């Protein structure tokens, strides 16, 4: 009887202690995630100190030049990944300190020695730990067009966008300034009506209101709202769910090396019908934090110009601000405020929750 009593007491103690242990472990993982995001923020600052600008959100070239890299490449030398940065094949003669030509991990053009093919080998099985939140339940490295590459738990923030009154299903939303355009950020965004990859991404809205935007180099001087009032990085480190409650990974399908195939700035792009508008590793804020619906316009697991911020942390996500600090923002954060915090020059009063 005494033995049974002891066993029962031990069982009760384990039941009481286990949640505390799990909470402590998650607190440690969240702290590690915060440190990662601080390192990335410091990397952005050091890049700016070296080149007087932040890296472009993504770079792209002509159809023959193929896919460029996202801003992650520019950060590599500043997050203890100098060796990887030096091994990446440089094509296209970019400006010093900026992205290495146009060819990312894909679009090798069918040539065995093209930069795309060579970089696929360079990036293969290289784990970039700073890109991964320890709380993220998804596989940190997985196959991307034949290479095993890191899929970041974090994403660059292009800006914030509002919705217009769309027309019939499948009809492109109005362009900036056109009839029917009610987007208050209309001077700093473009539509992503891409002929490629279909789905809800065809009603995506891409912004250029932040500092990590396509084919454009922006710096502190452009952040007129103040660096403590601009989000530059957010989390995408948890599963989404489709209408059947199946788990869906919305980190994109090509991992950290993938940028864009477009050479234009967002504000000069025309309607994308017949073109490929994809920009990987970036999102424009359109939906509340913690939104996990995969059927909303602009969301997708190939790429999603409006994929929402999500994390495995309870109640919200961590974000990196342009001043390098990291803040936790809850799922209940006011959406209009979140969009303004994604915009470098909104001219409005912002108060972080």
Predicted segments, located by residue:
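Internal low-complexity, small-residue/proline-rich segments
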Residues: 23-353
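N-terminal single-pass transmembrane signal-anchor helix
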Residues: 1-29, 33, 39
């Amino acid at each position: 009887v005494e033995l049974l009593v002891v066993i029962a007491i031990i069982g009760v103690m384990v039941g009481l202690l286990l949640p505390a242990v799990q909470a402590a472990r998650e607190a440690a993982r969240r702290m590690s995630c915060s440190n990662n995001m601080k390192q990335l923020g410091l990397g952005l600052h050091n890049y700016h100190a070296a080149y007087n600008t932040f890296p472009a959100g993504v770079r792209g070239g002509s159809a023959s030049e193929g896919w460029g890299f996202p801003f992650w490449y520019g950060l590599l030398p500043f997050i203890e990944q100098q060796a990887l940065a030096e091994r990446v094949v440089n094509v296209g003669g970019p400006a010093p300190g900026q992205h290495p030509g146009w060819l990312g991990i894909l679009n090798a053009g069918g040539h065995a020695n093209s930069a795309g093919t060579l970089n696929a080998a360079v990036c293969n099985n290289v784990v970039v730990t700073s890109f991964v939140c320890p709380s993220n339940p998804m596989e940190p490295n997985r196959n991307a067009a034949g290479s095993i590459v890191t899929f970041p738990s974090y994403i660059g923030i292009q800006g914030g966008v509002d919705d217009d009154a769309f027309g019939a299903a499948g009809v492109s939303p109005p362009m900036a300034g056109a009839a029917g355009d009610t987007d208050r950020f209309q001077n700093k965004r473009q539509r992503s009506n891409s002929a490629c990859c279909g789905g809800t991404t065809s009603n995506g809205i891409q912004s250029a209101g932040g500092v990590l935007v396509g084919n454009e180099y922006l710096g502190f001087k452009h952040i007129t709202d103040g660096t403590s009032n601009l989000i530059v990085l957010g989390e995408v480190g948890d599963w989404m769910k489709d209408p059947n409650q199946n788990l869906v990974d919305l980190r994109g399908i090509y991992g950290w090396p993938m940028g864009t195939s477009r050479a234009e700035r967002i504000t000069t792009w025309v309607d994308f019908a017949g073109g490929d508008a994809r920009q990987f590793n970036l999102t424009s804020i359109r939906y509340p934090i913690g939104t996990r619906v995969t059927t909303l316009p602009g969301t997708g697991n190939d790429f999603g110009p409006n994929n929402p911020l999500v994390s495995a942390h309870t109640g919200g996500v961590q974000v990196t601000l342009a001043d390098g600090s990291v803040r936790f923002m809850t799922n209940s954060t006011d959406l209009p405020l979140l969009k303004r915090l994604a915009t470098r020059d909104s001219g409005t009063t912002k108060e972080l929750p």
